[in-house]
């Protein structure tokens, strides 16, 4: 391990860590990035959605060589019960633009590519190295990290914590609390391989067009959670995630949940004949605005999942991670160019930039939504999906029963399940949390 001092140390080589490291290295800072995995992305085998405008702000010409799977032209939203789904979808040829807005990616490939860009920009990336603790000076300022390499210490003016939602470095140092189980989801995912032409036929795609399905309902067995399906070039990323607190309360097994989701009559035909080659579990921050910890201090900043920056309502995580990492890197670069000290007062520039961005604005707008869905999960994820399915079937079934009788039966079913006050109360709380 080198003994030289760096301008910045970035702990973690995921979306936020790579964005921060690149932002600083490309501006001439001496950057060391530590990754505990064998290579960046080795612990992220799952698929994901990448939002182009966030990456364009970091690497404008990323489309030239980034490992992109498909650009998304169709979004489907499903409300599922045990045997059916009621859905809506949006598809537009406008998304077949010269510079598409969203892509599916395989994190293992993408993270490795982005880390390579960090190296090309002048950063140093050291893999299979775990940061075990922060190093402090006598004034209480972080001045580096200790590693598992024979207890070695690496010094820097500032440390960027991009260690993920369950990172121990920040919690051990007392910079943040261990996230509460109600604010973290466990997602289990599989990668199903199919020929490219089969995927195109099943989803009505041409070229490198892609489709995303996001689903909620009885598939989560009364827990707050969602299922998802992403189309890649020659594979399908399939998974489901629920709050850890719900798993603890119900004793449901995550993989059993995924297995049932795969066998659902709306999903099974889409993955029939596929070969499963990869399985992964991943923790996702779900607490939203109210769960955001301290973002900066004397000699340190927190970015990405470690800062609970994930928009669960709009299913946005990677773009918030890249945006926060970029802003942290830019703020540190500005402070460095001014000859400033990396103390809490100076590093608050990062928080100011974040507060003025869409990241915090969007999260604060719907700060009450995570709590509402968590405390009312049986209604929103079981009762209403079943009622909606029943209403939809009543609407389309024709068997000689007068329409007025079907309408009365549908209304009665809703009132039996929730009552007038319950329906109005749920609607008001949902609207209030959404605005």
Curated annotation (Swiss-Prot):
Q: Please give the Gene Ontology molecular function terms for this protein.
A: oxidoreductase activity
GO terms classed as biological process:
nitrogen fixation
InterPro entries, A to Z = FAD/NAD-bd_sf, FixC-like
- What does this protein need as cofactor? FAD
Q: Which Pfam families match?
A: FAD_oxidored
Q: Mind telling me what this protein is named?
A: Protein FixC
User: Which keywords accompany this UniProt record?
Assistant: FAD, Flavoprotein, Nitrogen fixation, Oxidoreductase, Plasmid
SUPFAM superfamilies, alphabetized: FAD-linked reductases, C-terminal domain, FAD/NAD(P)-binding domain
């Amino acid at each position: 391990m080198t003994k030289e001092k760096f301008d910045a140390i970035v702990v973690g080589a995921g979306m936020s860590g790579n964005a921060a490291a690149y932002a600083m290295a490309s501006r001439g800072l001496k950057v060391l990035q530590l990754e505990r995995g064998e290579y960046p992305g080795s612990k992220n085998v799952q698929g994901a959605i990448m939002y182009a405008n966030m990456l364009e702000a970091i690497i404008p010409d990323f489309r030239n060589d980034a490992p992109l799977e498909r650009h998304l032209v169709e979004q489907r939203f499903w409300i599922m019960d045990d045997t059916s789904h009621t859905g809506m979808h949006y598809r537009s040829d406008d998304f077949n633009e010269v510079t598409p807005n969203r892509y599916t990616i395989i994190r293992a490939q993408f993270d490795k590519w982005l880390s390579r860009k960090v190296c090309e920009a002048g950063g140093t990336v050291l893999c299979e190295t775990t940061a075990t603790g922060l190093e402090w000076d006598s004034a209480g300022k972080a001045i580096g990290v200790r590693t598992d390499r024979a207890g070695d210490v690496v010094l820097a003016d500032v440390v960027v914590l991009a260690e993920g939602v369950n990172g121990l470095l920040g919690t051990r140092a007392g910079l943040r609390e261990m996230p509460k189980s109600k604010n973290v989801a466990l997602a289990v995912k599989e990668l199903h391989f199919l020929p490219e032409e089969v995927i195109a036929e099943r989803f009505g795609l041409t070229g490198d067009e892609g489709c995303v399905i996001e689903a909620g309902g009885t598939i989560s067995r009364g827990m707050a959670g969602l299922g998802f399906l992403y189309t890649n070039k020659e594979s399908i990323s399939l998974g489901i995630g629920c709050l850890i607190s719900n798993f603890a309360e119900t004793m449901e097994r995550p993989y059993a949940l995924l297995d049932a989701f795969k066998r659902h009559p709306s999903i099974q035909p889409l993955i029939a004949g596929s070969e499963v080659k990869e399985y992964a579990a991943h923790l996702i921050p779900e607490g939203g605005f109210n769960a955001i910890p301290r973002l900066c201090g004397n000699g340190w900043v927190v970015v990405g999942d470690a800062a609970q920056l994930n928009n669960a309502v709009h299913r946005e995580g990677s773009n918030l991670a890249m945006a926060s990492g970029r802003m942290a890197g830019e703020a540190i670069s500005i402070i460095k160019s001014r000859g400033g000290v990396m103390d809490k007062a100076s590093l608050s520039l990062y928080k100011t930039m974040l507060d003025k961005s869409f990241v915090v604005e969007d999260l604060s707008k719907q700060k009450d939504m995570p709590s509402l869905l968590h405390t009312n999960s049986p209604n929103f994820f079981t009762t209403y999906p079943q009622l909606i399915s029943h209403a939809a079937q009543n609407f389309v079934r024709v068997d000689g029963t007068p329409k007025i009788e079907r309408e009365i039966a549908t209304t009665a079913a809703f009132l039996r399940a929730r009552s007038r006050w319950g329906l109005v109360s749920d609607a008001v709380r949902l609207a209030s949390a959404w605005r």
